[in-house]
Each structure stands twice: as structure tokens, then as C-alpha cells.
From Swiss-Prot:
Source organism: Streptococcus pyogenes serotype M18 (strain MGAS8232)
Record keyword Ubl conjugation present: no
GO biological process, one term: proton motive force-driven plasma membrane ATP synthesis
Pfam family, one: ATP-synt_VA_C
Reaction catalyzed: ATP + H2O + 4 H(+)(in) = ADP + phosphate + 5 H(+)(out)
A cellular-component GO term for this protein: proton-transporting ATP synthase complex
Gene3D superfamilies in alphabetical order: 2.40.30.20, 2.40.50.100, Bovine Mitochondrial F1-atpase, Atp Synthase Beta Chain, Chain D, domain 3, P-loop containing nucleotide triphosphate hydrolases
Name of the protein this chain belongs to: V-type ATP synthase alpha chain
Family: Belongs to the ATPase alpha/beta chains family.
Length: 591
């Protein structure tokens, strides 16, 4: 422990002298109030401290005391369904302890409840050899999540004691005799520094798709479990709704939602909606698998930087248990702005648009902690972290540094488009500018698993949309009637794909989520219409006759998005109906 004195205060940056025994990344208690801060720069005996609380009223001469520990999170039972701030203070218990709706400064509250008792069930017995990552036992944390208590990193040896029963997170529940003869006493909780990634046995190639229930994502721009995706877009384009939809319906075990510098009412929406929503995979409330980290725009700027690391560290902990985790960061632009502010106050050389020169490496550090891994431990298990980051470029300009540095790292780009949003086409993901580098892997995985020709259907549908884009210029100049019959059909089918398939209502109880079998059935119907109508045109039928003769079935295809999942056979039955009606047009002599 080292004690120094404040010499200058500049917003969230405090400079203290007499800190020669301190280290970079040490946590400090700043001033008489004991505000939480982290050392981010050392120059001789002077330390620059990033303070995670409001610094007004703090002045030169006040003491600074280091703890000798880096910024760490507590990992154990009690994380799920909880809401933390950027440095893992539990907001509901904070409010009860301080009897205030605001964050009172200098209040220290443990992240995990020290009074709550958890029923621990051992999985190993005394005398067994254990290594780091082995699962010692389980705690049923929620109806959905079984919390697996693991041997901490760098601990191994012989299990000499393990107890069943109800314990708090600080009670000793097991003892391990290590190779040097010392006894390690372990509890249900462990701590981990947030800026250090948790070790794994092996990184694996992600191949299994993350099913989100959003048709434009799952069909054209899929992300894998263990992948990384970016959602850039201007204000009002629907970034937050896309993130909420994925958090609600993604086929993962755990969701960690980090509200980083965005509006407080967006976190309020999450708190209001999530407890009422039922997870289609488990039948339980979605809050039973969710951890919320709220660091809204009216909270201290410096804590935004910590909130992203806090979220990804909690995600790594659940990944190490063998779970698939999705982490949503909304938005990484606000996090980058916090980096820019601290860099400016440190008087560092600025890079593009005032952001620090190390912006790219910091963004890479975050996204590279995602992935599919084989975890530590003698038991074989895999875990995944899927990282999805919203980016809010000013004015929707994706050439700005945060977006460009993000695109260098992630493999999926869901580009939200202001003109689409203005036309009320949601999700406003532009199918011409977005991309997914996982498309081939996911397509072959689905073809193999479902024994279907999915990747071919996706390619055909995208080709129709691209053909429509190339014809639009001609239509604007000389009108739709000047096109050939085949091109008019292409325009009609493209409109069907856009309006009846890609457009999706997040606030409709049925349309908000579409399972993969339903997506395939809907797309098959549209492509069957295109194929059969093309054949009819080649046999001499007129385009207008085909459209009039199939008006009823096309209307049913358009309404199929509102057919519940349990009535899937109704959608599949439309394929034969399409063929039948087009043959009927030919038989009537629509030539």
C-alpha cells in the first residue's frame, strides 16, 4: 500500500505525487471521500489516475491510497439477473444501502451479495487430483443456469476437503493440497483482473450459426457462435432494437448486455421488457440468463472504458464453464469517446479525429476475447463468446476511425441504412452493403445438418436483390413498363423478398422471432414462385396474367410471416399451391 497526495485535478483525471511504490493499473482510493480510481500512467513518482466517479470537490493536498490490486471483478453465484454499473457495483443493492436514486460517491459495496446462501452440490470427492478449470461442484443459480464452481487458475493438487450444503460466496467449501504442500482454501467466488483475458486450452474455428430469429441476419449475414459482428448506423436506424432482439432470442445460454454511454431509457426498456419475455429455448423468463451492465450517458465517462472489460470478463467466466455466451456492447463509439477524452487529458499525441493512436489495438483487444474455445481442465468441454458491438458514427459516416478499426477485426458487418429506416423498413440492414465472412461455413454446416440445399437458395435470393438494384436506375429513367417481361418478374420477386421476407416487426408477438425451419419454408415459397413464373414466361405466358392469376397465393405468402411456428405445415403447403396456380394460368391460355 502506497500513500500519495493529489497535485492536480482535471475532470476524471487526477495526478498524485509520492507514488513511487505504486504500479500501473493499481486501484486507488482518491481523496477524503475514497473515490475509486485506476493508475493509467506513471512518470517518476507521479501517477495519473483515471477516476471512475465524479471528481467535483476533490482538490490538491488530499490523500491517494493504492490497494496494490488491479481493477478486478468478482465471479461467482449471484451474477445472473443482476444489474451492475461499469465497475461492477450492484445498482439495486447500492440504491437500498444509500437510500438514494443517485450514485453516492465513495460508497464501497461488494459486487456479490455476502449474505445470500447458495446450495452447493459437489461433483468430485476427497482424494481426487484436480487442475485449474476442473468443475468441483454446481450451484443452481436460476431455473435455467447451473453455476459450475471451477478450480481457479494456477491452482492444482489433491482435493483434501469438499463440503455439501448452503454457503455464502465467502465461505470455504473446498481445500486443495498443492504440490508445494500448501493448502488452498477455496470458496464459491473467485476474482479476475478485467484487462487480462482468461486463459484457455485451445482456440477453435467457429462453425455453428448463432440463430437470432431475425430473417435478414440468419439468411444473408449470419454470425457464428464465437464470432464477432458490428452494427454501425446513424441515429434512429435501429441499432438498439437489433441488439435487443438478439439479446432476447439468440440460441445462447447466457446474454451479457452492456449499455455503454447510451441513453438510460434504453436500459429501462430492457428492465421492463426482459422479465416478461419467455425464452423460446427454455420456456423461462429471459432475465434468468441475462447479466446487465449499465453505464449510461449521465454516469462518469471514465467508467465507460471499464464497463466493456467488465462485461467481457464475466462472459469469459461463463464460457469457461462450457456455456455459449453472447455479449452486446451498445455502443463501442461511446467507449472510444471515453478513451479520446482520457487521452486528451493525458496530453498524448492524437490520431485520426482526435482519437488516440492506440484506438485500433484497444478495439482489437476487446473483439479478440470472443471465440470458440476448448476450456482449461481435465474434463473436455467447449465454450463460446459471440461479441456484437453497436457503432454510432456521427452522421452515419462509416469512414470515421471507430467504424473502420472495428471493420478490420470483425467478420460480420450489419450496415444499418438511414433511407431504409425512413421508409419504415426494419431491421434497416442494407443487403447490398452488409456482409458476413461466415456465410460459406454456416451454409455448409446447415446443408450438412438439415440435409437441405440452403446455401443455394440464399445465393439465388441475393442474386435477385442484386439484379433489382442494377435495374432500378433504368426504371427511374424510363419506367417499369419499358423492362422485359423477365426483368419485370425479377422486380416483383425482389419486392416480395424485401417486403414479405426481410421486413420484420419487432413488436409483433409472432413476427418478432422466426425459427430456422420457418425461414426456409418462407424463402422456398418465394423462390418457387420465381422459378415457376420464369418457366411460364418462357412458355409464352404474359407477366400481367401470371400476377393476376397468382394474386391470392402471393397474398398468402406475404401473410405467412404472421403464421405461428406450430402451424408451419400451412407455410410449406403454399409451395404446391404456387405451382398449381401458375399451371392454371397456363391452362387458361394466359399466352
Amino acid at each position: 500500500m502506497n500513500q500519495g497526495k493529489i497535485i492536480t485535478v482535471s475532470g476524471p483525471l487526477v495526478v498524485a505525487s509520492g507514488m513511487q511504490e505504486a504500479n500501473i493499473q493499481d486501484i486507488c482510493r482518491v481523496g477524503h471521500l475514497g473515490l475509486v480510481g485506476e493508475i493509467i500512467e506513471m512518470r517518476r513518482d507521479q501517477a495519473s489516475i483515471q477516476v471512475y466517479e465524479e471528481t467535483s470537490g476533490i482538490g490538491p493536498g488530499e490523500p491517494v491510497v493504492t490497494t496494490g490490486c488491479p481493477l478486478s471483478v468478482e465471479l461467482g453465484p449471484g451474477l445472473i439477473s443482476e444489474m451492475f454499473d461499469g465497475i461492477q457495483r450492484p445498482l439495486d443493492r447500492f440504491q437500498k444501502a444509500t437510500d438514494s436514486d443517485f450514485l453516492i460517491r465513495g460508497v464501497a459495496i461488494p459486487s456479490l451479495d455476502r449474505k445470500a446462501k447458495w446450495a452447493f452440490i459437489p461433483k468430485l470427492s476427497v482424494g481426487q487430483e484436480v487442475v485449474a478449470g476442473d468443475i468441483l461442484g454446481t450451484v443452481q443459480e436460476t431455473a435455467v443456469i447451473e453455476h459450475r464452481i471451477m478450480v481457479p487458475y494456477k491452482v492444482s493438487g489433491t482435493l483434501v476437503a469438499i463440503h455439501a450444503g448452503d454457503f455464502t460466496v465467502t465461505d470455504t467449501v473446498y481445500e486443495i493440497k498443492q504440490e508445494d504442500g500448501s493448502i488452498y482454501q477455496g470458496s464459491l467466488m473467485q476474482t479476475w483482473p478485467v484487462r487480462q483475458s482468461r486463459p484457455v486450452a485451445q482456440k477453435l474455428i467457429p462453425v455453428e450459426p448463432l440463430v437470432t430469429g431475425q430473417r435478414v441476419i440468419d439468411t444473408f449475414f449470419p454470425v457464428t457462435k464465437g464470432g464477432a459482428a458490428a452494427v454501425p448506423g446513424p441515429f434512429g436506424a435501429g441499432k438498439t432494437v437489433v441488439q435487443h432482439q438478439i439479446a432476447k432470442f439468440a440460441n445462447v445460454d447466457i446474454v451479457i448486455y452492456v449499455g455503454c454511454g447510451e441513453r438510460g431509457n434504453e436500459m429501462t426498456d430492457v428492465l421492463n421488457e426482459f422479465p416478461e419475455l419467455i425464452d423460446p429455448n427454455t420456456g423461462q423468463s429471459i432475465m434468468e440468463r441475462t447479466v446487465l451492465i449499465a453505464n449510461t450517458s449521465n454516469m462518469p465517462v471514465a467508467a465507460r472504458e471499464a464497463s466493456i472489460y467488465t462485461g467481457i470478463t464475466i462472459a469469459e467466466y461463463f464460457r469457461d464453464m462450457g456455456y455459449s455466451v453472447a455479449i452486446m456492447a451498445d455502443s463501442t463509439s461511446r467507449w472510444a469517446e471515453a478513451l479520446r477524452e482520457m487521452s486528451g487529458r493525458l496530453q498524448e499525441m492524437p490520431g485520426d479525429e482526435g482519437y488516440p493512436a492506440y484506438l485500433g489495438s484497444r478495439i482489437a483487444e476487446y473483439y479478440e476475447r470472443s471465440g470458440r474455445v476448448r476450456t482449461l481442465g481435465s474434463q473436455e468441454r467447449e465454450g463460446t463468446i459471440t461479441a456484437i458491438g453497436a457503432v454510432s458514427p456521427p452522421g452515419g459516416d462509416i469512414s470515421e476511425p471507430v467504424t473502420q478499426n472495428t471493420l478490420r477485426i470483425v467478420k460480420v458487418f450489419w450496415g444499418l441504412d438511414a433511407p431504409l429506416a425512413q421508409r419504415r423498413h426494419f431491421p434497416a440492414i442494407n443487403w447490398l452493403t452488409s456482409y458476413s465472412l461466415y456465410q460459406d461455413d454456416v451454409g455448409s454446416y446447415i446443408d450438412r445438418k438439415q440435409q437441405s440445399n440452403w446455401s443455394n437458395k440464399v445465393t439465388r435470393a441475393m442474386a435477385i436483390l442484386q439484379r433489382e438494384a442494377s435495374l432500378e436506375e433504368i426504371v427511374r429513367l424510363v419506367g417499369l413498363d419499358s423492362l422485359s417481361e423477365q426483368d419485370r418478374l425479377t422486380m416483383a420477386v425482389a419486392r416480395q423478398i424485401r417486403e414479405d421476407y426481410l421486413q420484420q416487426n419487432a413488436f409483433d408477438s409472432v413476427d418478432t422471432f422466426t425459427s430456422f425451419p420457418k425461414q426456409e419454408a418462407m424463402l422456398t415459397n418465394i423462390l418457387t414462385f420465381n422459378e415457376e413464373a420464369s418457366k411460364a414466361l418462357s412458355l409464352g405466358a404474359y407477366f400481367n396474367e401470371i400476377m393476376e392469376g397468382t394474386a391470392q397465393v402471393r397474398d398468402r405468402i406475404a401473410r405467412s410471416k404472421f403464421i405461428p411456428e406450430e402451424n408451419l405445415e400451412q407455410i410449406k403447403g403454399l409451395t404446391q399451391k404456387v405451382t398449381k396456380e401458375i399451371h392454371h394460368v397456363l391452362a387458361k391460355g394466359g399466352i
